[in-house]
From Swiss-Prot:
This is Ubiquinone biosynthesis protein COQ4, mitochondrial. Its EC number is 4.1.1.130. Belongs to the COQ4 family. The gene is COQ4. It comes from Eremothecium gossypii (strain ATCC 10895 / CBS 109.51 / FGSC 9923 / NRRL Y-1056). InterPro entries: Coq4 (IPR007715), Coq4_euk (IPR027540).
Length: 323
């Protein structure tokens, strides 16, 4: 009798627990069904409510309008983000520090370039283009440099001594593409924005026609060439400050070979911003270099390999002498 009472008493808590669990599960299911029903009634599911999309568009436009109200002006071209002067100063400072410590992150370089592209520099570049017939045509036609526009398959079939094949070969060797160039975002004037976009897109042609790779020393040399030739502020900053983080052997190569070459070539060459590269793809690359006043520097990769081999050979001789 006592055992039976004890069994009944022990079973009651278990039944209570099971009933409570079933009740909670039922509330969860019923509550979920109720929420689904409410969502369907509002048109949140399957867009059954005809006003749903219109409401969503209104909410999106309201958010965008709220964002526009915080900007100093309305956007003046696709992708334009107007900044206040203090935001530009902050962008310059932060992107400058990030570019110095993390030059491998291309977005840091992109933001620093636009932050440093002050209007007086861009206006000077515009006057340079307006003073030249080809430059004026570039401003008028505003061509775009991309793989589809250039027809890379066609460039691959061109004779090896042409600019087009040289450009194609350099892109494939370095594993890059002109399509990776970021759009201009923070420059306010639409004409200035296109000029900076053009400068940015032509950067790979400067590499290809000089044969300089995209390793850090090659980038610094091309930046120094750009600074001397067209006066790009960010390029000048890069040429001056970037070598500070390099090893002694790298700084020595830049100081003795590539920076003197870049400054001399940049100052003596024709303004590269006025070159309509897309129309010269079938031209002989050596003849084009002569016309532009560009002298090819020593092969950077080859010099690096030769110097590395000499250091290794010297180290082996020293170690054998020690033993």
């Amino acid at each position: 009798m006592l055992r039976g009472k004890a069994t009944v008493a022990a079973a009651q808590p278990r039944r209570t627990f099971v009933l409570a669990g079933m009740l909670s599960l039922g509330q969860l299911v019923i509550g979920r069904e109720a929420r689904l029903a409410d969502a369907m009634a509002r048109g949140d599911l399957h867009n059954k409510n005809e006003d749903y999309q219109a409401k969503q568009l209104q909410e999106l436009e309201a958010r965008l309008q709220g964002l526009r109200n915080t900007r100093p002006s309305a956007p003046r071209y696709e992708g334009h983000v107007p900044l206040w002067w203090h935001e530009k100063a902050l962008l310059f400072g932060i992107s400058g520090l990030r570019s110095f410590f993390h030059p491998e992150n291309g977005m840091n370089i992109v933001q620093l370039g636009e932050a440093a592209a002050i209007p007086c520099f861009l206006e000077s570049l515009r006057r340079t283009m307006l003073s030249d017939a080809t430059g004026r045509r570039i401003l008028r036609e505003q061509p775009n440099i991309s793989e589809p526009d250039l027809d890379m398959d066609k460039l691959a079939q061109l004779p090896t001594n042409t600019l087009g094949h040289t450009f194609y070969r350099w892109l494939r060797k370095e594993g890059v593409t002109p399509d990776t160039r970021a759009p201009v975002t923070y420059i306010d004037d639409p004409v200035h924005a296109y000029i900076f976009k053009r400068y940015r897109q032509c950067h790979d042609f400067y590499h290809a026609i000089t044969g300089l790779p995209i390793i850090i020393e090659g980038e610094i040399a091309v930046k120094a060439l750009e600074a001397a030739n067209i006066g790009v502020p960010m390029a000048a900053l890069g040429a001056l400050l970037a070598p500070l983080r390099l090893r002694a052997a790298q700084r020595e190569r830049l100081r003795n070979i590539y920076l003197p070459w870049a400054i001399e070539t940049g100052l003596s060459a024709k303004p590269l911003i006025n070159v309509y590269w897309e129309e010269l793809l079938e031209h002989d690359v050596d003849q084009l270099r002569a016309e532009l006043g560009i002298r090819v520097p020593p092969d950077l990769r080859l010099i690096r390999q030769e110097q590395l081999q000499r250091r290794r050979s010297f180290k082996m001789k020293y170690e054998s002498f020690e033993n």
